[in-house]
Amino acid sequence: MSPQTETKASVGFKAGVKDYKLTYYTPEYQTKDTDILAAFRVTPQPGVPPEEAGAAVAAESSTGTWTTVWTDGLTSLDRYKGRCYHIEPVAGEENQFIAYVAYPLDLFEEGSVTNMFTSIVGNVFGFKALRALRLEDLRVPPAYSKTFQGPPHGIQVERDKLNKYGRPLLGCTIKPKLGLSAKNYGRAVYECLRGGLDFTKDDENVNSQPFMRWRDRFVFCAEAIYKAQAETGEIKGHYLNATAGTCEEMIKRAVFARELGVPIVMHDYLTGGFTANTSLAHYCRDNGLLLHIHRAMHAVIDRQKNHGIHFRVLAKALRMSGGDHIHAGTVVGKLEGERDITLGFVDLLRDDFIEKDRSRGIYFTQDWVSLPGVLPVASGGIHVWHMPALTEIFGDDSVLQFGGGTLGHPWGNAPGAVANRVALEACVQARNEGRDLAREGNEIIREASKWSPELAAACEVWKEIKFEFPAMDTL
């Protein structure tokens, strides 16, 4: 008989409860290139040793349960169990540890973010022996990432589709986010695109409400896109939110967007779920649609420093599940986002190979091989005075999205769009000439406003607006 299935009825098995660390804490283990590696921030209950806490995480997120079971003898735990292979204290924190866990690749279904998360962050987060638990990072091996399609198109293909190079893309979320009729909504889209923006956007909670049904919105937005393209000679788009109550309805909306000939649709990937998101990403690649991703609900999961899932993990999961854009914070706007941490997961979204760098919160070297990259979207409380910093922080491969910073212009939507486009072009030109955007940014904007009355008006309106609060999530 195979040693995996051999049992001895006369001996039976030793029933009862035993410490997790006896089986799942293996500091001598050498990780394999095919292992999925996880870094957990563990806060044990008083009296629980860190080795037992780390082993409990490895056990409960893989093959373990609370007691010994006779069916353990029917398989090879050494082959399938998760292993806590290293534990280190968190500097400056009492009774917090980083527990490193290795998972064999055979534990996970190919091409399924849903299955990966169900194992790694499933029941274990409610484990009583832990006061708190946070998944800080994952190392996804090429052997697993290659089972995913990833983004429908990626950064280079998107630039080729839009014929836009050498600068960040400009967007705008239509406001008020709820309450407009479809025709008035389309009018706002047209004015913003005509003024110089590349994209406009449905807000995350715009789906198909009584005041504006999705089909009407799609039709009027498509009309706005075609009219703005004819006037400007540029390719334009609007993120039509296909998020719906069922996957079938979501795909139906994406099909209608394709029939209208628009370039991009949108999905709320956390509230919609990874299964729905992956299905939509596959449809988008097959049918030539770009896919914009909103991260609504992320702060419920990632904002607390000692419990939940860090956004860098959610960003990696999105790259695997599929999306061409994803909101990534602004550093300088109204939403949470510390600079080094933000730049860490921005690199994880865009680059092919990212070295371990604990100063930016990156616990593992990540090799994406040929998986396409995702454009980070900076959105939330930003305006023209932020343009130099945003251009310097995010670089060309990004989308800078101004909602109130466009629609709040005193002269209207189109002048607001003009102001943002002029500010962006001025910053890109100054950077290309070798000027320091971080040091000379305000002067660059003032110089540009001398020949752009739209920019001058925007500068006056938002000269005193700041969002200066300490970040909750720090290294």
From Swiss-Prot:
UniProt modified residues of type N6,N6,N6-trimethyllysine: K14
Any one GO biological process: photorespiration
Cofactor note: Binds 1 Mg(2+) ion per subunit.
Record's keyword annotation contains Magnesium: yes
Positions annotated to bind substrate: N123, T173, K177, R295, H327, S379
The record's account of how the chain is modified after translation: The disulfide bond which can form in the large chain dimeric partners within the hexadecamer appears to be associated with oxidative stress and protein turnover.
Anything else known: The basic functional RuBisCO is composed of a large chain homodimer in a 'head-to-tail' conformation. In form I RuBisCO this homodimer is arranged in a barrel-like tetramer with the small subunits forming a tetrameric 'cap' on each end of the 'barrel'.
Protein name (database record): Ribulose bisphosphate carboxylase large chain
Organism: Buxus microphylla (Littleleaf boxwood)
